[in-house]
Amino acid sequence: MARVKRGVVARARHKKVLKQAKGYYGARSRVYRVAVQAVTKAGQYAYRDRRQKKRQFRQLWIARINAAARQNGMSYSRFINGLKKASVEIDRKILADIAVHDKNAFSALVDAAKGALA
């Protein structure tokens, strides 16, 4: 049976991992064994946080909408319920943007929600 020399393959794999670990502190960017662990953990964090990012942004939008709605004398839940009844289909991302950048338009939406609830 022929002898298999894997020097090229191993070097390529090491090089790939060390390239991914570039910018890490200390041994994590220089020592292959430590770099593999660091890159693996970084991948796990990235996977988890891509999902958490969606939740966190929704949380932020809701907090902003709630603050703006309360400035106009209405709670968040009643505001959203009023918009649904008024058949206004604007998502929370856009509502939060309107709440921050266009107070008059948001006030009009609050009035529409109040009208639908009355």
UniProtKB/Swiss-Prot annotation:
Q: What is this protein called?
A: Large ribosomal subunit protein bL20
What HAMAP family would the database entry show? Ribosomal_bL20
Presence of keyword NAD: no
Provide the gene name from the record: rplT
GO CC annotations on file: ribonucleoprotein complex; ribosome
Q: Return one Gene Ontology term, BP aspect.
A: translation
Question: Is Ribosomal protein found in the keyword set?
Answer: yes
By sequence similarity, the record places it as follows: Belongs to the bacterial ribosomal protein bL20 family.
Report TM segments.
none
Annotated coiled-coil positions are none
Q: Which UniProt keywords apply?
A: Ribonucleoprotein, Ribosomal protein, RNA-binding, rRNA-binding
* Highest taxon in the source lineage: Bacteria
